[in-house]
Regions:
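Residue-level detector of beta-strand structural context in well-folded domains
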Residues: 34-36, 43, 169
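Cleaved targeting-peptide boundary
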Residues: 27-37
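Residues that flank catalytic or metal-binding motifs in active/ligand-binding sites
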Residues: 47, 167, 192
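Proline-anchored loop/turn motifs at beta-strand termini and strand-loop-strand connectors
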Residues: 40-59
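Secretory targeting and sorting signals
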Residues: 1-28
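Conserved polar/disulfide-associated segments of primarily extracytoplasmic proteins
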Residues: 58-176, 183
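Surface-exposed amphipathic alpha-helical segments
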Residues: 51, 173-199
């Protein structure tokens, strides 16, 4: 029993070391391999092969990382719910990135709408208030720094009672006109962006 415990601990440490030193290798072991996705302005991300990429419009690219009940339906889009994913948005999406569809400004957060929006986590709830939780510069591949903002947000019911919390993370590259937006706190995304390439 003791020998099995030691072996399990050693195996766990080996996996941890591989994850910390080689994110791409960690993705491969989890999903059976990786693939490269070429996006705007030469930005290329290495992602697990199990992830789907919806590229119907180059300014609204969605990388689906898990369950997505709206995929393949007419509800699929930026204002849907329950779709584990992140977005890579371009100039057309940025032109309507704020309330009342004004141009995006990173200090306010991306939220194109003129009315109450559906909560990204549940179609039974609505977006509530959000507050800035973190900001700074983050590496997105060699030679590129993104203007990073993390917003602590809520989802509320019809009586405006808070029912759940989520974070909206944004990496904005103003020169390339690219915004990476994540509402699911995907644990691998920061490393994927840091290890991005530009061609």
């Amino acid at each position: 029993m003791f020998r099995k415990t030691i072996s399990a601990a050693a195996a766990g440490l080996a996996v941890l070391a591989a994850t910390l030193t080689a994110p791409a290798a960690a993705f491969a072991s989890e999903s059976g391999g990786t693939k490269q996705v070429r996006l705007r302005s030469g930005l290329t991300l290495t992602i697990p092969t199990s992830w789907k990429v919806a590229k119907d419009d180059k300014d609204w690219v969605r990388v689906i990382t898990g369950s997505c009940p709206t995929y393949g339906t007419e509800d699929f889009g930026f204002r849907d719910w329950g779709c584990h994913s992140f977005w890579v948005l371009g100039p057309k999406a940025l032109k309507i990135g704020l309330r009342t569809f004004q141009a995006y400004k990173s200090k306010y957060g991306y939220d194109p709408a003129t009315d109450v929006s559906i909560c990204p986590k549940s179609y039974k709830l609505y977006k509530g208030e959000w507050k800035l939780a973190d900001k700074g510069l983050r590496q997105v591949g060699p030679g590129h720094k993104a203007d990073y903002h993390k917003w602590a947000a809520t989802c509320v019911d019809k009586k405006w009672r808070v029912k759940l919390h989520y974070n909206q993370r944004e990496w904005y590259l103003p020169t390339s006109k690219i915004l990476v937006l994540d509402q699911w706190d995907h644990p691998q995304l920061s490393a994927i962006l840091k290890n991005a390439t530009w061609n």
